[in-house]
């Protein structure tokens, strides 16, 4: 949506009590996306360590799958914020 930012700026200029929370939400999506990516990296490292060191293959697999889900969500939020 190429006009989304223009609409947000217009709402902010005319009605700041409505527009300012919209701008904050727009910025927080990328912050949440980065946090999800960092958590997903931690989960994948924990999963790889569990899979390589011990015999808890189910737990390691769960950590790897969780990291893929969180990483996908983080990439989606960052992509939607920048498009």
Curated annotation (Swiss-Prot):
Subcellular location field: Virion membrane
GO CC annotation: membrane; virion membrane
Induction (free text): Expressed in the late phase of the viral replicative cycle.
Transmembrane regions listed in the UniProt entry: 31-51, 59-79
Coiled coil regions in record: none
Homology family: Belongs to the asfivirus EP84R family.
Entry protein name: Transmembrane protein EP84R
Organism: African swine fever virus (isolate Tick/South Africa/Pretoriuskop Pr4/1996) (ASFV)
Source organism phylogeny: Viruses, Varidnaviria, Bamfordvirae, Nucleocytoviricota, Pokkesviricetes
